[in-house]
Amino acid sequence: MATKQGTPKVFHKMHVKTGDTVQVIAGKDKGKIGEIVQALPQLSKVIVKGVNIKTKHVKPQQEGESGRIVTQEFPIHSSNVMLYSTKQNVASRVCYTFTSEGKKVRKLKKTGEILDK
């Protein structure tokens, strides 16, 4: 992402983090469930395991080496995923609440399940 010289990079606040289980709610992989492998806050995108798999043809880098075909997960926008409760098997929106110790945690609206420990 090209930015003008002297301007800071913009990091978008995302409702999901690396390691969260999510369900895809839009796109060609709608309905698939997977774990977030990597979050990209600069682009507001996430890489979900087993979702948005594309085939990439790689040229040989050295002489004598043969080219190969690689399949890998590509990023999807964070707005196209919804947090998923593995205990209740339901996708839910997220809200923020405070624990009795005063720590801010994420909570699933449908189930009341606390995500952050």
Swiss-Prot record:
GO biological process: one example: translation
Coiled coil feature spans: none
GO MF annotation terms: rRNA binding; structural constituent of ribosome
Top-rank taxon, per record: Bacteria
Presence of keyword Nuclease: no
Entry keyword set: Ribonucleoprotein, Ribosomal protein, RNA-binding, rRNA-binding
Pfam families: KOW, ribosomal_L24
Keyword field contains Ribonucleoprotein: yes
A GO term from the CC aspect: ribonucleoprotein complex
Quaternary context: Part of the 50S ribosomal subunit.
Similarity section: Belongs to the universal ribosomal protein uL24 family.
Function, as annotated: One of two assembly initiator proteins, it binds directly to the 5'-end of the 23S rRNA, where it nucleates assembly of the 50S subunit. One of the proteins that surrounds the polypeptide exit tunnel on the outside of the subunit.
NCBIfam families on file: rplX_bact
Name this polypeptide is given: Large ribosomal subunit protein uL24
Organism: Nostoc punctiforme (strain ATCC 29133 / PCC 73102)
Protein encoded by which gene: rplX
